[in-house]
């Protein structure tokens, strides 16, 4: 599996927040490029993990399709963009010990058949994986093209995240979040999860 390694985040000392969004992280044209690439990989039914580390399709928990965007010469620019945004956001708000991306980027599609992802966290421990620290969600679709499909974060109060096209939202992987059912159109997003304590060889640095 490709590994995208990050150099340490700068310390801007702004203060910790539950989540933060980076406006205009990607242009509409770049969002279209990502969509075309993700669709070319033929997204399949999304799976969920379990305590015994098995994975299965469980539409009562998650109903969507996804494909995995590997790090290569055609996608390096996406990893670079996300890596730079992540370093800045982490330096401003959390200052976690983040080493990089240990999974491919997840291109996800929510169709108007009420596709959704119920409340969950991203930092479930897996024996062969380092701890997840920060999650990133990129809004690829123009919000006028669908209804529902809201990314929501829950700290006791439910917060609906801005869905402007190209916006990048970052939050700790232990934060409870969900995607509400899509009722019209199609919502497409890109998800990245950063890790700490990578011990495998480095293939890229930013």
List where the protein language model places each region:
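Fe(II)/2-oxoglutarate oxygenase catalytic core
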Residues: 1-168, 174-198
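Single conserved hydrophobic/aromatic residue that forms the stacking wall/gate
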Residues: 197-206
